[in-house]
Amino acid sequence: MEEEIINKYSLLKKFNVSRETYFDFESLISMIIKKNQEINIISKKTSKNDDIRTRHIIDSAQIIDFIDLNSNTTSDLGTGGGMPGIVVAIIIKNLKKKMKFNLYEKSYRKSLFLREVSKNLNLDTEIIQKDVFLSNKIQTGTIMARAFKPLPVILDLVSNNFKSYKNLIIFMGKSGEKILKETLKKWDLVFEKKKSITNKD
């Protein structure tokens, strides 16, 4: 049974992810499926076990090598159902690293869900039920953004509202190359691109 679960996460073999993490991921999937019957945690189109595992959990987990492990905090700009914030927090917990995750989420009901998940999985998170655009002078290590806002909007937010940070991780999607090309006309960025392991686009 254990090996069967671990094999479902074979795409993550080359990453810094412990075996214990996969069982926490399975618990997270169960909590998402249960809560998704009450509120829209994730799209109904991707709410089956395998879809959640690949399109949400593994997709979020693949950024772990870009997380600044020397920082005390990491921030997720609009975590929604906990992707990538909760997923990365699970990995960090099982790596025995001390790091707090500040997860911004405007929705009251999603915030309650995130607090419940954090409690059940013993995660070091602070669920901030607030529009991150209304916060300022934020200090953090890594900043994460997945399915949040367009790249130029995120860059403006980080530039205006963050006092300090180490690095910024943005999931770009299918039109990522085009958006990046347009953004570079206005922004002077030092960046590294990484091909997704869950999506050929």
Regions found by a protein language model. Name each.
Residues 155-168:
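A short glycine-rich, Lys/Arg-flanked "PGG" loop and its adjoining helix->strand segment in the class I
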Residues 175-201:
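Active-site capping/gating segments
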Residues 1-70, 75, 108-123:
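Class I SAM-dependent transferase core
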Residues 100, 124-126, 167, 188-192:
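Conserved beta-strand segments of alpha/beta enzyme cores
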Residues 80, 147-150, 174:
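Short glycine-rich anion-binding loops that position phosphate/pyrophosphate groups of nucleotides
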Residues 48, 132-133, 193-198:
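Short, solvent-exposed loop/turn elements at beta->coil junctions and helix N-caps
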Residues 165-177:
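Conserved beta-strand signature within the Rossmann-like core of class I S-adenosyl-L-methionine
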